[in-house]
C-alpha cells in the first residue's frame, strides 16, 4: 500500500533546496509533493489523477516525454519512482531539463542492485526482463548532463509500499492488497507471481527464508539501490 514516508519526504525536500516552483512529473496520487512549495503535477493516468487528495497540487494530464509547458517554466522538476515507467527515458529527461531552470531532483532506483534483493533473486527473477534496455544510473546522469547521487537506504518500517519497502517484513508480500500497490506484480505473468508467492509462503513457514536472510532481521535500514539524483541546470 502506497503512502508517503516522512523520512523519504524529508530527503526529497532537502534535495530540492531553495526553489519555489516545482513540476512533479509522473506525480501519481501526489505523494512527496512538498506542501511549502508551489507544485504543479503532471500525470498521464486518469485513475491516478482521481486518487489525488483534496487540496493537492493542481494536476495536468500529460506525459514526461511531451511536457505541456514552455522552456524554463519552473525552478525545479522532480520525479519520484516514475522515470522507469516512461516510454522514452532519455526524451523524458530532456524534457525535465527543458522546463527546469535551476534544478532536477529524481528519486529513482539503480538496476544494478538487483542482486542485492532477496525478493528478485529468489522469487521474481523475471523482473530483470522488465528493466528497460540501457536503463542505468550512468546513462541517466549522462542524459541529465551530470549531477550528484545520494544513496537512500530504506528503513525497515518504511511507510511507503514500493517494491523493496518490505525487505524485513517478507510476509507483507503475501497480502494481495500490498501487491496491488506494486507495479511489478501487475507486469509479471500471473502464473509466475502465483508461483513466487507460494514459494515465499512455504519458505517462511519452513524457516528457509530466515535461514537464508536472517541477518537482515538485525538491520535498521538497507541499501537496495534507491537513489536521489540532483542535477543543477546550467543555462
Which residue ranges define each predicted feature?
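Conserved alpha-helix/loop element of class I SAM-dependent methyltransferases that forms part
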Residues: 2-20
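Local beta-strand N-terminus motif with an aromatic residue
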Residues: 19, 74-75, 101
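Class I SAM-dependent methyltransferase SAM/SAH-binding core
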Residues: 21-67, 91
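A short acidic, Gly/Pro-enriched loop at the edge of an enzyme's catalytic core
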Residues: 65-76
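A short SAM/SAH-binding and catalytic strip from SAM-dependent methyltransferases
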Residues: 76-90, 110
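A short glycine-rich, Lys/Arg-flanked "PGG" loop and its adjoining helix->strand segment in the class I
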Residues: 90-104
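Conserved class I S-adenosyl-L-methionine
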Residues: 103-137, 157-164
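Conserved Class I S-adenosyl-L-methionine
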Residues: 149-235
